[in-house]
Amino acid sequence: LVGGCVRDLLLGLRPKDFDVATNALPEEVKRLFRNCRLIGRRFRLAHVFFGAEIIEVATFRAASAPALGEEPLADLDPEEGEGPEISEPEEFDADIADTEGEDSHVLDMHGRILRDNAYGTIDDDVWRRDFTANALYYNIADFSVWDDVDGADDGRARGLKMIGDPETRFREDPVRMLRAARFAAKLDFTIDPPVEAAIHAFSGLLASAPPARLFDETLKLFLAGHGAKSFSSLRRLGLLE
């Protein structure tokens, strides 16, 4: 288990869903589970259907040399640990799609990730996630929590710290700024000063984010029981301008 569900359990909260990270490739996950489909080209994921629930399964990501690429795609981001996006991303059929020759890690001219399907190990994966409190892994084999970035301590202290350089991470995915505002509102987290400064400096990057992802994040901000706090957080961070 990975991400928000582990964070919430450590904080004594009830997770709304559970996400899985694995070294199995998406195509391997699909072969294991009958009720499974692969989605997304920007971030290829497996959705395993268990009754009315959807279990999101992401393969460990790794850093790779980026290539400059094409127009942005509006798929969901596996770093989130927040369950499937509300709007339906493009379904990907691994049995018929031809992805041979495609770059696995593509950035646009502003540093935004357009495609990220470079797979690696759990040690690689942790550094691809956004905030330290979301980079927690629960190993069901020995019931241990893997924490390489002091995310548990940051979560208990209600501090929202970014993994890596905030400017670089926001350029990779501007929607992370909205996620920071949401976590501050939802969990009463205090945003780390360097992170907050970067949000004020680079809020204009949100104009380049895919509309579908902005829509999904807006729904999470205002329709999850903390709408007033979300509005205050967005206004304080200059994200409504």
Model-found features: residue ranges?
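Catalytic cores of the polymerase beta-like nucleotidyltransferase superfamily
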Residues: L1-E241
